[in-house]
Amino acid sequence: MNPLQHIEQTYNFQYPKLYHRLWEDGMLDVRWQKERWWEEVFPELKKNPPLLLFRDQFMGLDDPEEIVNLIEDYKSQRGIKAEYLLVPFASECEGDVCFFYHREKPELPPVIVKDWYDFDSAEIIADNLQNFIFYGLLSIVYSIYAKASSLSDFYENIANIYRTHHSYLSEEQAQVIKEIYNRKLTNFPCSANKEENRYSSYLIAKHLSDYTALLSDEEYIDLLNKYNPISTPEDDREFFII
């Protein structure tokens, strides 16, 4: 029994088949616990990037003990309702965690939920893991932190992450990412109105000043609506953890 099967048996939960494939392919192994990770491990991982390596300090969770501890911690410390089964599979910056949500119809693949820790609430951000990967790959080149250590070899990094990720997308999704990743960085003017809510569908943060990216705010939103459509009505996507 591998660690994923142990989690499935413990919580009567079924990971998506694609997640098992990512596990078997070593795409969840970031070796985060090793000392001098940024100096020694990260440069090696960049050559064959694991799952969404360059996204918002994204770190896939591959330690079953850590996963179980997170599930139980969320139940006790965050007061998760009994009807929710949230199985964590990644963490991001500032304590945010991505989960599989075992919803009311367990015969369907679990949806992807992101817990925004500071807001004590979570939101459905993808109907399935494949669409979430598309969303992650798109977001990497939509919001670029100019001082990021990876920017010096930006084009090499995105070429590498496309190479290791495209087989987990649909053919059409992969073609869209390939076309965008072949672009050159462009300076875009700010398009957000001052009175506009900073968060919209997918909790998208529109740029509030001029920005550099491979695609504009408008194209980013259009592509997410087309290739990461969420079946849950917008008013029902966000729910409070406690």
Predicted regions and their residues:
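A surface-exposed partner-binding patch
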Residues: 1-105, 182, 190-242
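Generic alpha-helical structural element
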Residues: 8-11, 118-122, 166
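Short alpha-helical interface elements
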Residues: 32-33, 114, 154-157
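Compact, glycine/acidic-enriched structural inserts
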Residues: 110-148
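Charged, amphipathic alpha-helical linkers/stalks
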Residues: 145-161
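Intrinsically disordered, low-complexity segments enriched in Gly and acidic/Ser/Thr residues
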Residues: 162-196
